[in-house]
Amino acid sequence: MNDTTTSIIRDEPVPTPAADKVYGSDAIAAMLRALDLPYIALNPGASYRGLHDSIVNYLGNRTPQMILCLHDEHAVSIAQGYAKASDRMMAAALHSNVGLMHATMPIFNSWCDRTPVFIIGATGAWDAAKRRPWIEWI
């Protein structure tokens, strides 16, 4: 049998010149690394789009490595399962409001199970001038 883990491709940053700018999402990504969180499960979206870039381009998609999920609920459940199997805490990023509401059951399950999950959330662009047409107005 082939080892399937050797065929998994991890997203890696494309080398670019050093940036003159410092982003707030880089600070959040650095904090996740300082906490020694190996993975962060998230459902990608506009709420925290800068964090995606910082995890890949600032941290090289290592510690934490992004695990893309189809739903906020899945992200918390995956983090809970990882913590149970490895005895290490994992992060889950949730969209504010609806994402948090969708994830309430796995958050409750983790609490009942006394399994640590590091949860962060985001709200997206607050400044109306920085919102994209239509999608960030609903």
What residue ranges belong to the model's regions?
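N-terminal alpha/beta PP-like core and its mobile active-site loop of ThDP/TPP-dependent enzymes
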Residues: 2-138
